[in-house]
From Swiss-Prot:
Annotated InterPro entries: Cys-tRNA-ligase, Cys-tRNA-synt_Ia_DALR, Cys-tRNA/MSH_ligase, Rossmann-like_a/b/a_fold, tRNA-synt_1_cat_dom, tRNAsynth_Ia_anticodon-bd
PANTHER family to which the protein is assigned, alphabetical: CYSTEINE--TRNA LIGASE, CYTOPLASMIC (PTHR10890:SF3), CYSTEINYL-TRNA SYNTHETASE (PTHR10890)
Binding site for ATP: K274
Record's protein name: Cysteine--tRNA ligase
Motif 'KMSKS' region, chain ranges: 271-275
Cellular compartment(s): Cytoplasm
Family under the similarity heading: Belongs to the class-I aminoacyl-tRNA synthetase family.
Catalytic activity: tRNA(Cys) + L-cysteine + ATP = L-cysteinyl-tRNA(Cys) + AMP + diphosphate
Record motif 'HIGH' region, residues: 29-39
Length: 473
């Protein structure tokens, strides 16, 4: 496959350092508030990317961190707990990390290889800072804070394509007290009264954001690893500064081979932000729509482009999900009606080939979704009408190809339905079949309505009837 690499500004052939193993790191949330649909877009994209690689036979080690101590967390704790904040601040990240896992499960995001937390890795971060000071890339300020000296790193700005001289000129501010340069950034922040703190050789305090991710990613994945990702808003300064730290610490130009970034999410043409009051939480969306519909809505936009979020888009996606399930349910039932030999040639190989071709081209999920949807409609309009002319092996092969495509996008995840509901629907289908054979159509229509009350829709294909059961949640 070929993927766009922000580091080179080119679509490149994707290869891994170790054949058959893909190691990746995605910057996780700072858990100080509700997880929103912008977050969801990033983590669903990398879940699809992971599923695609797994479908090609890769083992994928995907690491997602939690920045569980930060200025925003401290501010939230003070807002909620007042003078008790210094004791109770951990309640804030714990609450929103739990919410992250809750919505991830409802979005069918597969568990990561590891979920490191900043607070569990402070000792490692202190060791890194000591090494950077010793190497001459960092310095200690009078208050005990430690800053990374950007000017000591060759080619700073390589990821964001910015020159250090232009960045300094653009800053238009005097350096903060203790800083040598306005672009220098904190590796260690000195403690202030009422804040959480950890011991260090310089002063009580806590690690800086940019250091945290590079320490945790390389700890779990080694150096170099295959891909590093996140939202496009992290390119500068966060990812730029990660590269600078790793370059100073390891002496490597780039500690990750591919840098993959997901575009902004907009609402009515404006970037989603708290200041505009247009933030939409994942809990809100998932209270009204299925996780599969939201996944599909994300996939209907190319990952690198801005995505305009709307509930109309989710309505459209939910309708597509319904069609995908109809094709799956009814084709699954049709296996029993297939014969021993093929009397016609029918398959969905062309849809599957086009699906994978789209993903091979910079992960074009909009085209892949079109192919999956086209395959579903072909199954309903053509395959189900010809089941009696196909062998069981052929029908099973079509079903397997269809499910393989759906699994990459992360839909048809609710294939299992309540056994008692399915048995009740099957019984109604059998009763209705007898009524139709006896031409008691009014009674047959009544039975159809009873099935509908159970959440099932019945579709007739000549003498055969197949059903699909509506999924909830």
């Amino acid at each position: 496959m070929r993927i766009y690499n922000t580091a080179t500004r080119q679509v490149e052939e994707f290869t891994t350092y170790t054949p058959g193993l893909a190691r990746g790191y995605v910057c996780g949330i700072t858990p100080y508030d509700h997880v929103h649909v912008g977050h969801g877009r990033v983590y669903v994209f990398f879940d699809m990317f992971r599923r695609y690689l797994e479908s090609l036979g890769y083992e994928v080690r995907l690491v997602v961190n939690f920045t569980d101590i930060d200025d925003k967390i401290i501010a939230k704790a003070r807002e909620e707990f007042g003078p008790e904040a210094y004791k109770r601040w951990r309640e804030v990240p714990e609450r929103y990390i739990a919410e992250f896992f809750e919505v991830s499960k409802r979005l069918f995001i597969k568990p990561a290889y590891a979920y490191p937390r900043v607070t569990e890795n402070v000792d490692d971060m202190v060791k890194w800072i000591s090494a950077l000071v010793e190497k001459g890339f960092a310095y200690v300020a009078p208050d005990g804070s430690v800053y990374f000296e950007v000017g000591k790193v060759p080619n700073y700005g390589v990821l964001s394509r910015q020159r250090i001289e232009e960045l300094i000129a653009g800053a238009r501010v005097e350096p903060e007290p203790g800083k040598r340069n306005p672009l220098d950034f904190a590796l260690w922040k000195s403690w202030s009264p009422g804040e959480p703190w950890w011991n260090s050789p310089w002063c009580p305090g806590r690690p800086g954001w940019h250091l945290e991710c590079v320490v945790m990613s390389t700890k779990h994945l080694g150096v170099p690893f295959d891909f590093h990702g996140g939202g496009a808003d992290l390119i500068f300064p966060h990812h730029e500064n990660e590269i600078a730290i790793a370059k100073a610490y390891f002496g490597v130009d780039n500690f990750a081979k591919y840098w993959i970034h997901v575009g902004y999410l907009t609402v009515r043409g404006e970037k989603m932000s708290k200041s505009l009051g247009n933030v939409i939480t994942l809990r809100e969306v998932l209270s009204k729509y299925s996780g599969e519909a939201l996944r599909l809505a994300y996939a209907m936009s190319h990952y690198r482009k801005p995505m305009e979020f709307s509930f109309e888009l989710l309505d459209q996606a939910e309708d597509i999900v319904k069609t995908l399930y109809t094709a799956y349910d009814e084709l699954s039932q049709a296996v029993a009606d297939a014969g021993d030999a093929d009397r016609e040639r029918v398959d969905i190989g062309n849809f599957k080939a086009a699906f994978y071709s789209a993903l091979e081209d910079d992960f074009s999920t909009p085209e892949a979704v079109q192919q999956l949807y086209a395959a579903a409609k072909y199954i309903i309009s053509t395959v189900l009408h010809k089941v009696d002319k196909l062998s069981k092996n052929t029908v099973l092969a079509i079903l397997a190809d269809y499910v393989k495509m759906a699994d990459v996008i992360g839909v048809l995840e609710r294939r299992e339905v309540a056994k008692e509901v399915e048995e009740a629907v099957k019984a109604l289908v059998e009763v209705r079949a007898r009524l139709r054979s006896e031409r008691l159509y009014q009674l047959a229509d009544y039975v159809r309505e009873r099935a509908k009350a159970l959440g099932a829709e019945l579709h007739d294909f000549g003498p055969r009837t197949y059903y699909t059961i509506r999924r909830r949640g």
